[in-house]
Amino acid sequence: MEQLLHYVWKHKLFPLSPLSTTDHKLVEVIDPGLHNRNAGPDFFNAKIKIAGTLWVGNVEIHDKASDWYLHAHDKDERYDNVILHVCGNIDTEARNSKGALLTQMQVDIPENVFKHYQELLTIDQYPPCYQIIPSLTKLTVHSWMSALQTERLSQKTEAIEERVRRCNGDWENAYFVTLARNYGFGINGDAFEQWALNLPLRAVDHHRDDLFQVEAIFMGQAGLLELNTIPERYQKDALNDGYFARLRNEYLYLSHKFSLQPMDYKLWRFLRLRPQNFPHIRISQLANLYYNRRAGLSQLLEATTVKEAKKVLSTSVTEYWETHYTFGSTSIRNEKHLSPFSLNLLIINTVVPILFAYGRHRGEEKYCDRAFDFLEELKAENNHIVRMWQQCGLEVENAGDSQALIQLKKEYCDKKECLRCRIGYEYLKR
């Protein structure tokens, strides 16, 4: 219950009766302080009147006073300026590293707060706070959604910055890796990222004017040009149609030239995948995009509208894949363009985060602003998370809202972090 005590202290949800220390001195909390989630006391720079005297310093909170010793705070000088030790149960006195006795105060969690908190933890429905959604003010919802949207973009920025580091500071390469990851559309995201990191783009650039060679390197590095990667029933047809063999021979030549090593094809997942999401199709689309010089960050930065961004990312498969989903398996002819749905997802999960991250990196707000503009312009994603919130009465107007709700579920609801959620706050204070 220590987390709940933190919450009660932070929001000053104390009982109406006067507060007092264990030695019966009256306490008035002027400012509970700044919540610290890192090492050190729980709240910094609190302002508290004790027996009429104003104290400014840090506050430490525990379930039991004896936890002070359990956590070895009595041996840690960082806790020497604690002006008040707040506990749910005072079961012992406490001293700091200098041997000075701490001022202690017992705080009881209000019954209604405890009851509502237990409801949030135990209700078998998502979201557990569904009862109060219709009563939330527009200001409360809008401010929280905006904060969640920024939080999600910041989280994605960290992932992009890590890719930039792995790409030795090359933003163009890091953008391609990010784009490739999102071509996995969830299920094959990790495999696509590994594939892109294993792709020597500088070597590919030497053959960029030859689409066949680009596709040979792309498919070969994905580990998809080995005969045993093709289902046995299609192997004979794959060898007879000639395209597989020509690609494989071209890759063998180029892999020897550039000392290439393919990834393990077993990393690719096919189970429950729609055929248009098969790695072969997505890799062919990426090869076409790369060949047409529309897979680079510089081209993307020139796109100032969603329409222009979609034009940059629009692509289709090479001719062979118009009638195939895997090597040797024929299908009805289909140019297999990226669907409007897929384009929207790529803009939400690739274009927007890369603009935001690059804008921060360069200190150019225009790219950050463009990222938010794109989210506002795009329609909200239609997934089970968004639909559940809509069923509770929440209005979801655009992709910014749907991204905020995904962040809310993954980082708050799933982790039971209701005490850090503004909707949870409204629920608890009822």
Describe each region flagged by the PLM.
Residues 32-37, 45-50, 68-75, 90-96, ...:
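Catalytic micro-motifs at enzyme active sites that drive phosphoryl/nucleotidyl and oxygen chemistry
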Residues 403-430:
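Cysteine-cluster motifs in flexible loop/terminal segments that predominantly coordinate metals
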Residues 62-66, 89, 110, 426:
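An acidic- and aromatic-residue-enriched active-site/binding cleft used to recognize and process polar
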Residues 1-7:
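N-terminal "leader" segments that precede or initiate the main folded domain
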Residues 80-82, 86-144:
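Compact, glycine/acidic-enriched structural inserts
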Residues 64-86:
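Mg2+/Mn2+-dependent nuclease catalytic core
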Residues 7-66, 79:
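N-terminal ordered "arm"
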Residues 149-404, 417:
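Hydrophobic, aromatic-lined core segments that form the binding pocket/scaffold
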